[in-house]
């Protein structure tokens, strides 16, 4: 139902044409699951300004892709805040860290959530609330855990991982 993944942008490849980015994404990004490729670019990564993309698909609908790349660790942290707000108030929104894209989530009912992304082409989707939020939490956890494991001397995402654990507990209590 949901596919969520994180890609890290290769700093040695300049993105000049968004129209070819999707078809050539492997030239510009490394999949977080590909540890050997990640390790091969470790020396050129700027861990204070880590660019990448979060890929989110619901069935066949693309909600986020490589064309919305940004500071990926910050974006994941922002998404965790949105999830926390949705669980607390039914609504959460954020702007991307380094570009003027607004992302929002609103509870439509106990079991539905409206996901909106004000990108060049506006994305709107009503998604199963529980499954979507859980998939996002798991996607964030995978990203932060994998980064901590792979780049132990360069990053420390323990605060984000603690927040994920807190969200899991709140999630299980609220939904």
Residue ranges with predicted function:
Residues 122-175:
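Mixed-charge, glycine-accented linear interaction segment located at domain edges/termini
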Residues 43, 90-96, 100-101, 148-162:
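A short, charged
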Residues 78, 85, 89-132:
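An exposed acidic His-Trp-rich patch
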Residues 49-95:
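Aromatic- and glycine-enriched beta-alpha-beta binding-site module
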Residues 37-48, 82-84, 102-107:
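Short linear motifs in intrinsically disordered
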Residues 1-56:
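N-terminal "first-domain core" detector
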Residues 9-28, 72-86, 152-159:
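Charged, low-complexity, helix/coiled-coil-prone segments
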């Amino acid at each position: 139902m949901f596919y969520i993944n994180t890609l890290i942008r290769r700093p040695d490849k300049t993105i000049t044409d968004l129209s070819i980015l999707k078809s050539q994404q492997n030239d510009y990004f490394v999949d977080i699951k590909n540890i050997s490729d990640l390790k091969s670019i470790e020396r050129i990564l700027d861990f204070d300004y880590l660019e990448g993309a979060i890929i989110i698909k619901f069935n066949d609908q693309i909600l986020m892709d490589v064309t919305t790349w940004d500071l990926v660790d910050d974006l994941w942290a922002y998404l965790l805040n949105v999830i926390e707000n949705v669980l607390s108030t039914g609504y959460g929104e954020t702007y991307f860290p380094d570009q003027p894209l607004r992302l929002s989530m609103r509870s439509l009912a106990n079991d539905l959530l409206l996901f909106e992304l004000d990108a060049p082409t506006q994305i709107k989707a009503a998604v199963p609330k529980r499954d979507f939020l859980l998939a996002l939490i798991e996607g964030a956890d995978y990203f932060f855990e994998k980064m901590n494991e792979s780049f132990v001397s360069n990053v420390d995402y323990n605060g984000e991982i603690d927040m994920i654990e807190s969200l899991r507990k709140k999630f299980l209590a609220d939904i």
